[in-house]
């Protein structure tokens, strides 16, 4: 994964989550729970999943979905999946 992608990855995903949650990017902290703190429902989670898979050309395995509870976990998973593609 290129250095530029790594540096921008967190900001890109933060922006994506803010758009889905209809919040300002500054409100999306690394450890805020998507469901409890940001009000995500199943449709919002599916929207995030679809956007992540399309933007980064990755496939997030079903067993990994339960690990996507906050920004930091999501960034870490996407980094790992991108690294595995190289």
Question: Residue spans of the language-model regions?
Answer:
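Thiotemplate assembly-line natural product biosynthesis machinery
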Residues: 2-26, 78-86
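Generic structural marker for isolated residues within well-ordered, non-membrane alpha-helices
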Residues: 14, 31, 49
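Short coil/turn motifs that cap or connect alpha-helices
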Residues: 24, 59-61
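N-terminal helix-turn-helix DNA-binding core of bacterial DNA-binding proteins
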Residues: 31-38
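Two-component histidine kinase catalytic core, primarily the HATPase_c
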Residues: 44
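Glycine-centered, phosphate/nucleic-acid-interacting loop/turn motifs that mediate DNA/RNA or nucleotide
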Residues: 56
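AMP-binding/adenylate-forming catalytic domain of the ANL superfamily
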Residues: 63-73
């Amino acid at each position: 994964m290129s250095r530029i992608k790594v540096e921008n990855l967190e900001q890109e995903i933060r922006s994506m989550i803010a758009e889905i949650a209809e919040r300002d990017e500054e409100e999306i902290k690394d450890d805020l729970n998507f469901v409890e703190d940001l009000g995500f429902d199943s449709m919002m989670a599916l929207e995030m999943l679809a956007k992540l898979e399309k933007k980064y050309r990755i496939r997030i395995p079903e067993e990994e979905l339960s690990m996507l509870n906050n920004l930091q976990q999501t960034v870490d998973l996407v980094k790992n999946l991108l690294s595995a593609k190289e």
